[in-house]
Structures are given as structure tokens and as C-alpha cells.
Amino acid sequence: MRKLLFLLLFITTTGFSQEIALLKYNGGGDWYANPTSLPNLIKYSNQTINTTIKVKPATVEPSSPDLFSYPFVHMTGHGNVVFSNADQANLRNYLLSGGFLHIDDNYGMDEFIRKEIKKLLPNNDLIEIPANHPIFQKPNMFANGLPKIHEHDGKRPQAFGVFINNRLVLLYTYETDLGDGWEDPDVHNDPPAVREKALKMGANILNYVFNN
């Protein structure tokens, strides 16, 4: 069950726009990659699954107390990630208090982020999420689990998660590049069907966060 902090947040925002955020981390990685992705996902979700999310996402640092204002925080990039001790403590408290962190590897982040996740949640394993998990079931069905958006190495797409007391608190999407699929159509020139898959999966993630 979500802790009191987030319960109060949801109660006070009922009927009003909620806000989600992009994580501005240290280490040299391009946390600012895919600038149009979150705004496009928000617009798509507001139009198709009746969310009421503010169109412009916030930007928040891992150690900031403002982190607790956002039920959903997104993180992406191509390279190095470093969480300081203060970052780790605040992020850990955020997740234990009911927050949700989605990390989308924009290709090149994997070797760095896995180490930081282990430091962040040393007592909880990062495990692969099966295709029958609810996050792949509604409102859009993905029978085979996470969709493939960009090829990169040609590996299969995988969704990993950290569960605490049976609640998914951290989602790590790997070898899919959802964020690229959320970008404006002319950024990567993805076929409309591929971009639609990415947006639908993103909508599923938001739906899961706001309803669990």
C-alpha cells in the first residue's frame, strides 16, 4: 500500500492535473536526451486513457525534496550515471514511500545503471518482468511483453523491475528504446505503427503507476 505522503498527494490532486518528472542525474550521461518524448507521452495518455497530467513535465534532481511531489519519475540517457550517497538515500526513501522510477536505456546506459540500481536497493534484486504482468495487459495488450522499438544490437527487449512488498517500484526497460518512440515523428522517422506501439506501452506504464 502506498504510504501516507503519496496518498495525500493523490487526494489533493483529484480532479486536477497531476505532474510527472524527468530525473536530472550526475555522472556525465545525457539525462536530457529525448526532449519531446515525455510531453508526447503525456499528451497521448491524456487523450487515450483519460489521465490528467500536466503537459510540461518537471525536472528534478535525485537528492531534491521535490522528488516526493511526483508519483512517476522518468530517467533516460546513453552513458554514465552516478548517484551520490545523498541521491541514493533520497531516491530509496522516495521508492519506499510510494514513488515509481522508470529507467529507459537509450542505448549505452546499461553497464552503468545496473551498478547504481544495486547501490540504490542493495537488498532487492532486479528481476525480469514476465509478459503476463499487468503492466503489459492494460489498457493495451502486449502478449509478448515489452515491444521492440529500435533495433540497436538486435537483442530482444527486456523489462526488469524491483519489487518491494510485492509492489513494482522501479522499472528498467532495456533494448527497446521506448523514449525514442515517444519523440516527435520527424526525430527518428519511425513508422507510425512502431511509434504507436511505443506510446501505447508508455500509456500502460502510466496507467499502472496511477492505479496500483
Please annotate each region the language model reported:
Residues 3-13:
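Sec-dependent N-terminal signal peptides
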Residues 16-72, 78-79, 177-178, 184-212:
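Aromatic-Pro/Gly-enriched surface loop or interdomain linker
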Residues 18, 68-71, 96-100, 124, ...:
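Loop/turn elements at helix/coil->beta-strand transitions in domains of secreted/extracellular proteins
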Residues 20, 72-111:
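Short alpha-beta junction capping motif
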Residues 37, 41, 87-90, 109-117, ...:
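Stable alpha-helical elements in mature extracytoplasmic
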Residues 63, 154-170:
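Short, surface-exposed beta-strand/loop micro-motifs that present aromatic residues
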